[in-house]
Amino acid sequence: MQKILVEFYDKENLENVFSLLSMTYDKVLFITFSDDKSNEAFENDEPLKRFIKRRAPHLEIGTVNVTEKKFTDIIDALSRAVNEKDAYDFDLTGGSEIVIAAIGHVVATSDNPNLSIHQYDIKTGSTVFRHPEYEILKREQSAPKLSVPEIISLHGGKAAAERNELYPNVIKLREGILKLFNAVKNCSKEWNTFCSIPFTEALNKDKMVITKSVENGNYMNVCRKIGDELEKAELITDIEIYKKNGRFYYEYTLNCKKEERFLYEKSGNILEYYTYLAATECGAYTDVCVSVEVDIDGLITQDNTDTTNEIDVMASSGHVPFCISCKNKAAINEHLYEILAVSKNYCGKYAIPVVVSNANNLPAIEKRAKAMGIVLIDNISDLTYEDFKRKLKCLI
């Protein structure tokens, strides 16, 4: 006797696979409809089929197509699909009222005694209902666990590159990340400018000497301010300001590990890695990745026309994805729309978009973010590292 899952195909792929991730089956039957073209959508849903084959390589995948989403048509299709020798488990999750009613009719009138139904709350990962037990079960702690690349692939994308693949021992850079963030956290505006100033670099006895052209008077002030903070933190040494060929230069020696050099290249890198480190160490997430470059068609090429987006920090707690955008300034409307679009496109409707900013957000932005379902964490320069970890942990 085979155990067969009957699943109504949905455009949200997490709903399509949640039962398969939670229980063991021999076969899955996806119910599709011609009138809403879900039959065509299923036929073209290669990300779903690839995901299922990776997670359950021996599972047989079948379909039952219904011409119209009518009560009698659904009953007829289900009745034809159900035989008397196998066990069938119907998933009600996300189903419309007419679908749920049709399943109830089939289960109640079928001669097959091995029919069951269940429903999940995808957000919490809990079992809401199961028949024939007729009981509401408490939240299960064994909700499915998905990695960040799995979540992206399930929704048709692919992680093109992850910075922590280039620097796999990010935890070994912990001290350097914390020291740099604490040095510049209260002068994020100047840090943004400092990192944008053109520079040259040279190697001197295994130390990197950086020279910035500071003809612009503001550049000189910025370099002095940031340089003082970095010098106090013992992150740079040998500061020298000099004039050559009528131009002023600000020169210093980086006092950091070679592997930490990238933290000084772009102003946003340090906030991203500080957030990544905190999310990793708070102990609440199944998987955490940083600087995740995502290709929506799932085909990574070297073609310059290949469209990709970057998610600063992405995490998963069980099956729930968190997409985190890191900003060295207050959040604005554009940031909200960006993270919402990226999270929905690459991680589905259950994704939780988050904006971490190192400034005080305006009340209007906070109100707008709440209406859009976006979580804001601002003024992180005022938080201790432990407080920041608690904030990230409370997202779950």
What is each of the regions a protein language model found here?
Residues 87-93:
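Short glycine-rich phosphate-binding loop at a beta-alpha junction
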Residues 93, 312-314, 327:
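Anionic group-transfer/hydrolysis microenvironments
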Residues 1-87, 101-309, 319-320, 337, ...:
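Long, low-complexity, Lys/Arg-enriched
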Residues 314-323:
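Active-site beta-strand-loop-beta-strand hairpin of nuclease catalytic cores
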Residues 326-335:
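Short beta-strand-loop-alpha-helix junction that forms the active-site gateway
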Residues 92, 98-101:
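C-terminal structured interaction module
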Residues 11-12, 94-96, 329:
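Short glycine-rich anion-binding loops that position phosphate/pyrophosphate groups of nucleotides
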